[in-house]
């Protein structure tokens, strides 16, 4: 009986210590996976970094759990893209608005979820009425702003700058974060340089993708994104015919995530995931896919 009592007491004490350690652990939140790698490169292991949208889930259908909402209010800081619908709705309910960091601040945004574009030499699969997805629009669109800034090496540099500025304000005495930030920026500049070099050497003018997730990437390097999907809607038969015909004429060799169309034009079907955690490695992989002959 005595041994049993001692065991229960020790177990309870250990449980209390674990709960206290969890409560004392400093936590940052990010809205999507690519932001965890970006912020993590700056803060290292000093914080636990929680991600709102789990791997494999869609930001478009995301609903936070009660546990996540409690965690957000307890978090030291919350980093978000600032352009995704659920972020606006959810983070407006946070009690301490000052700890919410909009990482897209200062980036020249592109209006709309553009579905098609012109190539420099010809109107690529647009039927003559396409809207460029690689150039900013000065007019408003009912479908808002393209949120995929994290797929752009140059936008990532600005996002890293915004993240570091917020971290420095909160923790001004940590020289380690400055060192980490400078190393991250060097990596992002190198990413930009090698991406631009690969695209220039490839001579490509445009690429075809199902969902327009690489709009900012295309703008960075002066190429065109021809997206099959229009504003989140399935493409019409006419649209598919236009894309297939133009792709055949131009000898397109691969389609990013649309198996049926790739089969119709005898091209390779390649799946890409813009929400992969390691943003730098993901952009390298996407560039290799786009430029590979």
Residue ranges and their predicted role:
Residues 17-293:
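Extracytoplasmic metal-acquisition and chelation regions
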Residues 1-15:
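Sec-dependent bacterial lipoprotein signal peptides
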